[in-house]
């Protein structure tokens, strides 16, 4: 149990997708102007990563990995070269289902997220989580823990940034730095803050 708690905390704070690996920056910067929208997208990312990382783990372990098709009588077949294509297809299908669900049941959030919801399909934070899972050879339970933790870490980062950006509206920011300039500086300082978690031994 301790191993999974450690993996979760590591994926949220120490190896934060947005502030340690700088993945998913497009939506991270574009949808962080309002806290409500940022939290909505963060929840969507948590849901997508919690589903796609473990599902892609099953796909890799039982179909794509070298020798994975031994259960079907093909022990020598290696389909790992289809990895990227397969991962993207599964992520796209998951996002499409989530998009239809939000459109039907939470239209206000669907409209607020706008074009950025379909962009989760090509959000490199989602793909990064899947590729890290494959590279580190996580089992299914570890993949589920890592997917939830990585998604939660990204959601936490975008919610924090949105809160800061809302406060910055009332600050006297120098004219040349208004907009993305002060946002990049803020993200850099947040990243430095999260680096302090690297000294934790769990």
Curated annotation (Swiss-Prot):
EC number: 7.2.1.1
Top-rank EC class of the record's enzyme: translocase
Single GO MF annotation: oxidoreductase activity, acting on NAD(P)H, quinone or similar compound as acceptor
Membrane topology: Multi-pass membrane protein
Keywords: Cell inner membrane, Cell membrane, Ion transport, Membrane, NAD, Sodium, Sodium transport, Translocase, Transmembrane, Transmembrane helix, Transport, Ubiquinone
Catalysed transformations (reactions): a ubiquinone + n Na(+)(in) + NADH + H(+) = a ubiquinol + n Na(+)(out) + NAD(+)
TM region(s), chain numbering: 5-25, 35-55, 81-101, 114-134, 144-164, 180-200
Compartments, as annotated in UniProt: Cell inner membrane
Assembly notes: Composed of six subunits; NqrA, NqrB, NqrC, NqrD, NqrE and NqrF.
Protein name: Na(+)-translocating NADH-quinone reductase subunit E
Gene source species: Psychrobacter sp. (strain PRwf-1)
Species classification: Bacteria, Pseudomonadati, Pseudomonadota, Gammaproteobacteria, Moraxellales
